[in-house]
Amino acid sequence: MLDKIIRIATRQSPLALWQAHYVQHLLQANHPGLQIELVPMVTRGDIILDTPLAKVGGKGLFVKELELALLDGRADIAVHSMKDVPIAFPEGLGLVAICEREDPRDAFVSSHYAHLDDLPAGSVVGTSSLRRQCQLRERRPDLIIRDLRGNVGTRLAKLDNGDYQAIILAVAGLKRLGLETRIRYAMSAEESLPAVGQGAVGIECRLDDDHTRQLLAPLNHRHTELRVCAERAMNIRLEGGCQVPIGSYAELEGDTLWLRALVGAPDGSQMIRGERRGPAAEAEQMGIELADELLSRGAREILAAVYLDNPAR
């Protein structure tokens, strides 16, 4: 059935298009002769650029329109950054493949400073991520953290124009766009714990579309799937969204999974951290247990306050 054209729903940003072309390349490498076309779309998250992401709220800020295209038959698969994928899917849709993960770390980007610790007091650092903001404020309460929206090119332009002394971006996005020279250094997980699924590309489709699911099966990277499964299980238990001060990062060491997580107050005044080590086969259960530990230690109250401040979530 290679005569059927597979339509990929994707956002129109340069990074999203890179991801869609990446999936196209993988599909055609595994299935020579397969015809593929891209269906570029604009999401709500792409349109509303003058408001912090946490204030815009809404589940699926960057994926809802793509999912609608799957449901009404305009597309066969949707390609997402895993960190943007909500904790629940519309009925009939699901995540069927997670590609091999790129570097999941955050990148410190600055025109004049080599390291976060080199920034003078009062320096302005740009990021709209509450996860990044709370960790920055804990480490450097003397900095001014300001929201920063737009695609990667827009954010770099604002840095270059002098609006910020530094900005925090994802290493994976910069590398994929050929902009790795802009990275001053990749921040360790101890310094900035990554977002759930950061650096991984996920593929969603209709669950009853057996043909497309068979085509996608070779694209799933088992090690990445286990790591992201643990991270997402933790996030689901916390009822976290994409725009909350939650970090989670799993590493595989042989058959052992090491899962770290944090929930932080946006002002950096409270940070609840935890970790688990166990068999990789128990990735999901580890995520649930770690979330329960964080909730019992005060994460519930922190998240309740965040949701009260950002009711649109």
Curated annotation (Swiss-Prot):
The porphobilinogen subunits are added to the dipyrromethane group. GO terms for biological process: protoporphyrinogen IX biosynthetic process. It holds the Pfam family Porphobil_deamC. Keywords: Porphyrin biosynthesis, Transferase. Tetrapolymerization of the monopyrrole PBG into the hydroxymethylbilane pre-uroporphyrinogen in several discrete steps. InterPro entries: HemC (IPR000860), Porphobilin_deaminase_cofac_BS (IPR022419), Porphobilin_deaminase_N (IPR022417), Porphobilinogen_deaminase_C (IPR022418), Porphobilinogen_deaminase_C_sf (IPR036803). One of its GO terms (cellular component) is cytoplasm. PANTHER family: PORPHOBILINOGEN DEAMINASE. Belongs to the HMBS family. Monomer. It comes from Yersinia pseudotuberculosis serotype IB (strain PB1/+). The lineage of its organism: Bacteria, Pseudomonadati, Pseudomonadota, Gammaproteobacteria, Enterobacterales. This is Porphobilinogen deaminase.
